[in-house]
């Protein structure tokens, strides 16, 4: 006797023969950052399937159920979760947020070896089930872990991307907007280099409507600057530490940043983002490191790097940023 479903629905194409999802996104790690990224991706309708993976089964099941109970209000057809990486099969984009959480006052670089050990398990499993994916690393220290993910995955470097300074630059533009009274979308400024303490503000390129702030204030960003714009960059560097001190972790801003990058990749928008990429040979960098530079993103990952015109002191800061990372990176075991 036919079931209620059988009486209601006449199947034209057997479910086993139907096309797989075309925009499947996997998020590895369902902590605060992972779930902020998940809801940001869902609310922007970027995926036709979302997969969640974590080692903590109860938390994973609870997060999946919570999302599924609200699925009426979303436009993502399928949300799945499992500790087994087979659930991630066929992903176009895999976002890695898993790792040890940064503690109050802890440098991102201090996290490194703990998270390298976690990546030894995660990355091979991702590639096993989604060999054609683009890998977006968010876990900190993101630049070093993007390098580690590249080495462990065997993927071409243009398909291994770190979230890098996309958020740093957003924070920079927000703080500019607060000073100038102009919407942050109209304030243009780039933070490059390490996502962290040695990041580099490109003061020579900061502008509103094409008007360079350095042309109006030649000392901007220097100790001589009477307006102390240098403190804006210090606020960018310190902001994560401040948020962690206040609420214990960062989540919403990085989640929104991940969705911003995911949209550019999945929709092949070819927008320019400051993301972490293999930068040996760029701006006098000689070591095998990943740093944030302005990159063109699309469905293939990073297709181009913009040759940013930097002043000598800015280029020297990028090289110092690279050296900072290399001094930690060369000691890693994986």
Swiss-Prot record:
Protein name as annotated: L-lactate dehydrogenase
Keyword Plastid on entry: no
Keyword annotations: Cytoplasm, NAD, Oxidoreductase
Entry GO terms, CC: cytoplasm
Gene3D superfamilies, per database record: Lactate dehydrogenase/glycoside hydrolase, family 4, C-terminal, NAD(P)-binding Rossmann-like Domain
Organism expressing this protein natively: Petromyzon marinus (Sea lamprey)
SUPFAM superfamilies associated with the record: LDH C-terminal domain-like, NAD(P)-binding Rossmann-fold domains
Claim: NAD is one of the keywords in the record: yes
Alphabetized PROSITE patterns for the sequence: L_LDH (PS00064)
Compartment(s) of residence: Cytoplasm
Region annotation (Disordered) ranges: 1-22
Quaternary structure and interacting proteins, as annotated: Homotetramer.
Gene Ontology molecular function, alphabetical: L-lactate dehydrogenase activity
Active site: 195
